[in-house]
């Protein structure tokens, strides 16, 4: 089995967001398969971290330095994409047909040099492909869920008082548009 360096802005024990929870499930699955996973916050990544690790997963990387992004481009890394970090606002929905003008695309070389860019759905992958024009984009076909969270969802679905209802999760993250969902 291999050693894996897992880079993300935050982890689930720091911020319980959707991307962070997905990362945690992935890390657990890797542990169960015998891999050693070392988690490092993106703003704490050092040159030696990149030098000493052959297999790297980069998740949310807003806080990753430009120098580290450049150095990673000569390494064996994949991007586990939770949103659209090739756009300054990370929301392709503000563009016609979800297609941003070329001058709005950022981090393209970082995506291009990745062995793969793993997107959470076919819709997500199609939008990323349309904007980045890359062949290394892959759809995972959905999110990763822990058994605990799947159990909670199953229980909610069994409750007749909760049928035919919906929920909006509060988020202060601008591109998630919580206010728009409420209105």
Regions found by a protein language model. Name each.
Residues 69-75, 108-113, 160-161:
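Short, conserved loop/helix-junction motifs that constitute active-site signature segments
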Residues 96-117, 126:
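Membrane-proximal helix-turn-helix segments that form the acceptor-binding/catalytic region
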Residues 55-58, 72-101, 118:
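Active-site proximal beta-strand in glycosyltransferases
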Residues 7, 120, 168-172:
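Short hydrophobic "strand-cap" motifs at the C-terminus of beta-strands
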Residues 1-63:
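N-terminal pre-catalytic "stem/leader" segment of glycosyltransferase-like enzymes
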Residues 152-183:
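Conserved catalytic-core segment of nucleotide-activated headgroup transferases in glycan assembly
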Residues 112-137, 144-146:
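A short, active-site helix/loop in glycosyltransferases that binds the activated sugar's phosphate group
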Residues 139-155:
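Short beta-strand->alpha-helix junction loop in the catalytic core
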């Amino acid at each position: 089995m291999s050693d894996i360096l897992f880079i993300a802005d935050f982890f689930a024990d720091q911020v319980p967001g959707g991307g962070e929870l997905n990362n945690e499930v992935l890390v657990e699955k890797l542990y169960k398969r015998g891999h050693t996973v070392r988690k490092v916050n993106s703003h704490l990544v050092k040159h030696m971290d990149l030098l000493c690790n052959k297999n790297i997963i980069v998740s949310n990387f807003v806080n990753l330095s430009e120098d580290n992004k450049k150095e990673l481009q000569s390494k064996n890394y994949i991007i586990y994409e939770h949103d659209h970090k090739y756009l300054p606002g990370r929301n392709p929905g503000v563009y016609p047909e979800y297609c941003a003008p070329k001058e709005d695309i950022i981090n393209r070389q970082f995506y291009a040099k990745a062995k793969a860019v793993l997107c959470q759905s076919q819709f997500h992958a199609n939008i990323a492909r349309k904007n980045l024009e890359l062949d290394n984009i892959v759809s995972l076909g959905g999110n990763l869920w822990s058994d605990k969270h799947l159990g909670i969802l199953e229980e909610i679905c069994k409750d007749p008082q909760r049928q035919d209802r919906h929920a909006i999760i509060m988020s202060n993250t601008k591109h998630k548009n919580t206010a728009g969902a409420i209105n």
